[in-house]
Amino acid sequence: MKNDIHPNYKELSVTCSCGQQFVTKSTMGKDAFSIEVCSSCHPFYTGKQKIVDTAGRVDKFNQKFGSFFKR
């Protein structure tokens, strides 16, 4: 094997927006990294579904296409 061709592999502190923190190893040049969703707050892992309504888009969709889904 050749020497000095591989990137540095060091610990990386990952912080989620929910407050969960964990340490992993990475070749990323940073010491810390922030993410929006982790396994502690992702709906797939928690079993809780969240609907994020941005500027009433869900209501607008329901007004426009709500009659298609009524039986």
Swiss-Prot record:
* InterPro entries found in the cross-reference section: Ribosomal_bL28/bL31-like_sf, Ribosomal_bL31, Ribosomal_bL31_A, Ribosomal_bL31_sf
Q: Which UniProt keywords apply?
A: Metal-binding, Ribonucleoprotein, Ribosomal protein, RNA-binding, rRNA-binding, Zinc
Which residues are involved in binding Zn(2+)? 16, 18, 38, 41
What's a single GO BP term from this record? translation
Q: Name the SUPFAM superfamilies on file.
A: L28p-like (SSF143800)
| Cofactor notes | Binds 1 zinc ion per subunit.
UniProt entry tagged with the keyword Ribosomal protein: yes
Biological role stated in the UniProt entry:
Binds the 23S rRNA.
Q: Which HAMAP family match?
A: Ribosomal_bL31_1
NCBIfam families cross-referenced by the UniProt entry: L31, PRK00019.1, PRK00528.1
Q: What is this protein called?
A: Large ribosomal subunit protein bL31
Annotated organism of origin: Chromobacterium violaceum (strain ATCC 12472 / DSM 30191 / JCM 1249 / CCUG 213 / NBRC 12614 / NCIMB 9131 / NCTC 9757 / MK)
Gene, per the UniProt record: rpmE
